[in-house]
């Protein structure tokens, strides 16, 4: 057997080996992306400032309309708490809805509190959508996923 006869076999083996390495690297990239995304989410979710804001919404927010909420909280801590918490859940909703993260992984942990927050703010959001139709839409679309897990 001549050396030239082995060339196609060597090339095919090298190509196959390269393809396997690329697949392994892509899996690692996916895993790294997952870790980076979820670590950031949990870091925010577990922070004292976020928890304080979330607890304020769930336990102290009493307004039932967007105009009433704005009248009492615009430019104050209440508005900041509302924007912080709802913005967070809306962004998580975007990740879940675009399937950039697997819902069970996140929602088994944060889903219960997301439901509590959504239940509390839903009347305000409905009212606010008269002016801003897409307001917190990804958060709302995530809520049924939260109930699944």
Regions found by a protein language model. Give the residues of each.
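Hydrophobic/aromatic-lined pockets within catalytic cores
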Residues: 21, 25, 42, 46, ...
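Membrane-interacting alpha-helical segments
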Residues: 50, 54-75, 123-135
């Amino acid at each position: 057997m001549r050396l030239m006869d082995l060339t196609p076999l060597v090339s095919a083996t090298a190509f196959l080996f390269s393809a396997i390495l690329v697949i392994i690297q892509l899996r690692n990239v996916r895993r790294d992306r997952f870790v980076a995304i979820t670590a950031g989410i949990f870091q925010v979710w577990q922070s004292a400032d976020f928890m304080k804001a979330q607890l304020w919404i769930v336990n102290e927010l009493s307004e039932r309309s967007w105009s009433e909420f704005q009248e009492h909280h615009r430019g104050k801590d209440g508005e900041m708490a509302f924007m912080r918490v709802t913005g967070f859940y809306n962004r998580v909703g975007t990740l879940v809805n675009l399937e950039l993260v697997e819902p069970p992984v996140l929602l088994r942990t944060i889903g219960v509190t997301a439901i509590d927050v959504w239940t509390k703010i839903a009347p305000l959001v409905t009212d606010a959508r008269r002016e801003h139709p897409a307001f917190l839409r990804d958060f709302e679309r995530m809520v049924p996923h939260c109930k699944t897990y």
